[in-house]
């Protein structure tokens, strides 16, 4: 099924960032009932977001702190609506709920109990400390900035007279408006014992729905059903990996075949032209002048064939498309390898990967966090053994094999260049021999002096087009890294150590693919 511009073929996440006032209501009135009414307004606002932005085949993920007041309401709304939530905190949770500001403790005992329950709720898929500053204001500001950077849409729930603070919800609202991030400003008011919100959207025209790169237009549709919850990482990644692997194989074959044809046709054209020059005139005087056109016609046909393949490679962007889909395939293999390991996938966002892939990576990260949130440490040894056998050992065998193959072809191309270049030099030097010695050299040897340099350059062109030098070194160094990592995995003593080693390994493996992508995308045959 072809891709609709507004409907991604796999479910993609839309992050809804949140910030709000700690105290939403005046002291008077039935606080619990008023908060319930505000919570209802927030539920309606969140449920309206997909329709507001015409989202199809997308799922929401909340991103917020877990302070008292508005943050607590947002967490409850996400919990009731079964929206996964990532919680970013300015400090470790125990310190956070016991912190004190200028007006005393941030949390009362009942608020602390409620926050603790929400923090351990099944809908919370990540608990992350977003700041290491010793300054309280800086901690809250840095956390809000992290929420802002992670969000596609922002919701700010503010009391009617909320004042601006660089580290508060009004500051978040102001920053979102300046950065052209769509933001819903919800101002709370109480009239005759009824709490309502005045909702004002800003920057809606700047919303960009997450989409798949155009290379995946023909990916079969995988619909998302909110009632089924988020898919398993394997279930989510498999369609992408299979499609990308199939496309990568097709592009790879086309690129290598076209590269060989382009180079060989130009070498062959040179050989034909040289033969034509050497035999020129042999047909004259025999009434067969039309034979003079045979070699030019053959040469022209070969050159046009090579040129045609060259233009096709550039017109279809074969090299870049191949690199792109292979990068997707390797990313999904990487994520599948750590699917049982309790860790975030931050390395996907640290590596220099194409920005078009950000929606996919963010969605994969949410799916992975949801699947590993429980983190059963008692089974970490089983996870380690599986990772060793299915990832480390498999990749080690792969890189060893590819290193030997790349090195063999690199040496072959290098030998051809040296041999034919040396032969060309010797042929040229033969011109400096005496007349008597030159008479014994067949006249066709001069033609080899034209052909051999072209063959030498052709060998180097094949080596460059296949990226043999860089691939050989990459395969060797990566295999060496995996050999060093393996004993560390065997000696690991906990899930934390396993997670650290796995993330280090995956960042290195995917980093090598990212480096290859950068070279391959802009490295053609000619």
Residue positions per predicted region:
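Acidic/glycine-enriched connector segments
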Residues: 2-197
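Conserved non-transmembrane functional hotspots
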Residues: 201-526
């Amino acid at each position: 099924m072809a891709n609709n511009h507004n409907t991604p073929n796999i479910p993609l996440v839309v992050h809804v960032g949140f910030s709000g006032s700690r105290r939403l209501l005046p002291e008077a009135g039935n606080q619990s009932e008023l908060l319930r009414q505000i919570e209802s307004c927030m539920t309606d606002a969140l449920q309206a977001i997909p329709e507001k932005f015409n989202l199809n085949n997308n799922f929401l993920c909340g991103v917020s702190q877990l302070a008292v007041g508005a943050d607590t309401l947002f967490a409850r709304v996400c919990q009731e609506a079964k929206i996964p939530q990532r919680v970013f905190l300015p400090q470790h949770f125990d310190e956070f709920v016991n912190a004190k500001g200028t007006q005393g403790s941030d949390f009362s005992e009942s608020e602390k109990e409620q926050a603790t329950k929400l923090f351990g709720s099944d809908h919370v898929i990540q608990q992350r400390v977003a700041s290491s500053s010793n300054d309280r204001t800086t901690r809250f500001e840095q956390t809000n900035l992290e929420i802002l950077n992670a969000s596609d849409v922002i919701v700010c729930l503010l009391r009617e007279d909320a004042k601006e603070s660089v580290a508060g919800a009004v500051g978040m609202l102001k920053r979102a408006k300046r950065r052209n991030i769509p933001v819903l400003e919800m101002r709370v008011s109480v009239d005759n014992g009824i709490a309502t919100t005045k909702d004002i959207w800003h920057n809606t025209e700047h919303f960009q729905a997450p989409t798949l790169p155009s290379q995946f237009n023909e990916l079969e549709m995988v619909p998302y059903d909110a009632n089924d919850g988020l898919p398993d990482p394997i279930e989510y990644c498999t369609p992408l990996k299979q499609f990308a692997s199939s496309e990568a194989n097709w592009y790879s074959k086309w690129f290598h075949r076209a590269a060989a044809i382009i180079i060989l046709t130009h070498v062959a054209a040179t050989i034909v032209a040289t033969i034509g020059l050497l035999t020129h005139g042999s047909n004259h005087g025999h009434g067969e002048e039309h034979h003079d056109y045979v070699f030019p016609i053959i040469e022209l046909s070969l050159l046009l064939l090579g040129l045609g393949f060259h233009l096709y490679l550039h017109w279809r962007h074969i090299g870049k498309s191949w690199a792109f889909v292979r990068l997707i395939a390797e990313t999904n293999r990487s994520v599948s390898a750590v699917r049982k390991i309790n860790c975030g996938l931050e390395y996907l966002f640290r590596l220099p990967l194409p920005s078009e892939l950000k929606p996919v990576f963010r969605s994969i990260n949410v799916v992975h966090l949801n699947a590993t949130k429980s983190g059963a440490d008692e089974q970490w040894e089983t996870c380690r053994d599986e990772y060793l056998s299915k990832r480390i050992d498999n990749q080690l065998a792969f890189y060893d094999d590819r290193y030997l193959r790349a090195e063999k072809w690199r040496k072959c191309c290098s030998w051809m260049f040296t041999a034919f270049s040396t032969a060309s030099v010797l042929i040229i030097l033969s011109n400096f021999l005496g007349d008597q010695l030159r008479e014994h050299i067949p006249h066709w040897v001069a033609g080899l002096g034209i052909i051999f340099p072209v063959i030498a350059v052709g060998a180097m062109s094949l080596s460059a087009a296949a990226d043999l030098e860089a691939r050989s070194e990459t395969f060797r160094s990566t295999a060496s890294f995996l050999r060093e990592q393996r004993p560390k995995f065997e000696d690991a003593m906990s899930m934390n150590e396993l997670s650290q080693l796995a993330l280090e390994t995956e960042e290195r493996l995917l980093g090598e693919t990212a480096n290859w992508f950068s070279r391959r995308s802009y490295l053609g045959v000619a």
